[in-house]
């Protein structure tokens, strides 16, 4: 784990020196990993179409949280705009997050962060406690389904988001037969 820095980090300087660290398919770099939370810089464009489900996020600032949800994942868009695709109330929904805006995503919400070219954001998540499970889901977007239909789901304990997601996403991208929807037989796009 990274120790707490002894001096402030000037993010613009860090970014100028490290932007090459933000590479596909996930495009993230861990800026800080403490006992309670992880702070990541994330760049665009990313090359993924999975929906991440994080069951561990707990809101520490109740005034920011909706009454319906006390679990959160924090997004702050530093440069450019992004799109956060979610599955909410058994339907797909797109949430634009513009430059300078922040958004708190309820925990256990399937979400796909779509990051465009030359965009930068910060994402904060809680550390995963022992026994917690993250999920990567891929949904069929080609068939005529009444509700979101999962093609594939990978369940794992996440200890390092930057290294664990990449091989799972790459396996999805390379396995055409594994991208076939069992209900409609359509093959999902790799990215």
UniProtKB/Swiss-Prot annotation:
GO function term, MF aspect, one: ferrous iron binding
Subcellular location: Cytoplasm
Function (record text): Catalyzes the oxidative ring opening of 3-hydroxyanthranilate to 2-amino-3-carboxymuconate semialdehyde, which spontaneously cyclizes to quinolinate.
Predominant location: cytoplasm
Presence of keyword Cytoplasm: yes
GO biological process, one term: 'de novo' NAD biosynthetic process from L-tryptophan
Gene name as annotated: bna1-2
Record-listed E.C. numbers: 1.13.11.6
Binding positions for O2 per the UniProt entry: 48
Cofactor(s) the record lists: Fe(2+)
SUPFAM superfamilies: RmlC-like cupins
Residues that hold Fe cation according to the record: 52, 73, 111
Gene Ontology CC: cytoplasm
Name of this protein: 3-hydroxyanthranilate 3,4-dioxygenase 2
